[in-house]
Amino acid sequence: MRIEPLLDELRLLATNGLEYADDPWEEERWERVAALVSEYAGETVDLPPEEVRERFAQEVGHVTTKVGAEAAVFDDDDRVLLLQRADDGTWGLPGGWVEPGESPAEAAVRETREETGLDVELAGLVDVYDRRPGECGFHGQVNLVYRCRAVGGGIDPSHEALAVEYRSPATVEAWHADHEARVADALAAR
């Protein structure tokens, strides 16, 4: 049994409990649950409990699943724009978390510009993908993948990328998470 889904559910309960607690004893109980989650979550991701607790504390209000957006940008030869991630060396679509006040579509455009240097415009939604806690990191997440066209800029990798290239999907030796399937879906949707 994986412990991450349990810890994430307890984290959500504690965060929401603290948000809506209406007496000091209830607040104290939820603080204790949050401290235990931080301790055990820290062991699963090799971080001190204090750092985990600080990260959790940055989430305010009702906690929901994280929302991400990615861009599938193809050239005329059906090669896809990929970045080699600096954190694990795998290849994946440009993308990231949706910022407050931003739509997922806007996030896909922004993240592509930030990570690759290219300006893109949307051509359509490919699909919506979900990951449960522990499948790819600690948090549950929903990711929207958009087909996009490059309309300007030039390849200029950010600090998050070791490389940015148009690649034939068949030549990619190590994919990030389930990005191979996402690229196949985007190619089929062209």
Question: What kind of region is each of these model predictions?
Answer:
Residues 19, 49-52, 156-159:
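Short, hydrophobic secondary-structure boundary micro-motifs
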Residues 1-32, 36, 90, 159-190:
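Nudix hydrolase/Nudix homology domain
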Residues 52-91, 120, 124:
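N-terminal strand-loop-strand
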Residues 16-20, 40, 58-59, 129-132:
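Alpha-helix C-capping/helix-to-loop hinge sites
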Residues 98-122, 129-186:
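Unchanged
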Residues 75-114:
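Conserved Nudix-box catalytic region and its N-terminal flanking loop in Nudix hydrolases
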Residues 62, 86-88, 93, 150, ...:
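Residue-level signal for pocket-adjacent positions within structured domains
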Residues 24-27, 31-70:
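Acidic, metal-coordinating catalytic segment for phosphate/diphosphate chemistry
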